[in-house]
């Protein structure tokens, strides 16, 4: 599956089932949001936070996801959610302890899983440099994707406000592209996120309403941060993208595709007079032969 659990973890004090708990929380790739008592390791909650079809739920006794037998790809190819990029990847989420709500840079990125013929015959899988090594039939992935096109699921990214105790989605903001930046929530009721198209935006944490946006002309992956110096509040982001976009190529609606992936450190404050000028669009026309 390639469902790593290296995504950021959040420490918090929460009241769970009427009792105060010191918890550790994570939204790993596999699509389930885990709340764990960090004093003893007890699993307290494990709700799906994105579309998840590879498993039905997490067994609260064992802590293991219960696989969906209908999505077994050993006999036929299956479109799986989440795919190997996960429902949440490197991009940092943010927790508002006063509300008990987490803001997740989530994504639905389906992937067509089919076992490699040699692997099925021998149980061995030869490493393929420069690509995913999941034991899958990637050599025939284009053919398989065409064959199973009528079953394909749509990739999308979104900012989600999620209650980790109830599993309820309070709101979500759909993005044009699936690969967007991490987020930061503030005590003033704002959550900031950059997107693949190059826009850094501020949303109302209560309802997801977009309150401010700025075109940076740079696709973003890292989370914004905020801090105060001499009474002035700043929002700063290391703008630039990476991960699968660098791996498989930039898609044509992203800022990285249009202008290039030139990383910059961008800082914002109220009443700033600095204006970021639009860069030239890259010329991608093929030279005449």
What are these regions (language model features)?
Residues 1-289:
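Beta-sheet-rich non-transmembrane sensory/scaffold domains
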């Amino acid at each position: 599956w390639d469902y790593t659990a290296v995504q950021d973890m959040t420490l918090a004090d929460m009241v769970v089932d009427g009792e105060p708990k010191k918890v550790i929380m994570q939204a790993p790739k596999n699509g389930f949001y885990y709340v764990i008592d960090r004093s003893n390791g007890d699993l307290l909650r494990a709700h799906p936070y994105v579309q998840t079809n590879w498993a039905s739920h997490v067994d609260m006794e064992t802590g293991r996801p219960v696989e969906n037998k209908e999505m077994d790809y050993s006999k036929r190819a299956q479109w799986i959610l989440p795919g190997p990029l996960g429902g949440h990847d490197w991009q940092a989420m943010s927790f508002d302890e006063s509300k008990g709500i987490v803001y997740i840079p989530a994504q639905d990125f389906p992937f067509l899983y089919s076992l490699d013929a040699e692997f099925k015959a021998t149980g061995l899988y030869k490493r393929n440099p420069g690509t995913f090594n999941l034991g899958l039939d990637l050599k025939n992935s284009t053919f398989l994707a065409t064959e199973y096109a009528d079953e394909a699921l749509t990739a999308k990214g979104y900012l989600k406000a999620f209650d980790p105790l109830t599993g309820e989605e309070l709101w979500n903001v759909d993005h044009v592209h699936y690969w967007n930046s991490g987020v930061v929530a503030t005590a003033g009721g704002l959550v900031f996120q950059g997107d693949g198209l190059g826009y850094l935006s501020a949303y109302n944490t209560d309802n997801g309403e977009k309150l401010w946006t700025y075109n940076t002309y740079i696709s973003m992956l890292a989370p914004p941060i905020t801090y105060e110096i001499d009474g002035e509040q700043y929002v700063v982001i290391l703008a630039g993208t990476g991960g699968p976009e660098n791996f498989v190529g930039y898609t044509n609606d992203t800022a990285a595709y249009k202008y290039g992936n030139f990383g910059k450190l961008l800082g914002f404050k109220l009443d700033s007079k600095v204006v970021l000028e639009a860069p030239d669009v890259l010329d991608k026309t093929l030279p005449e032969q």
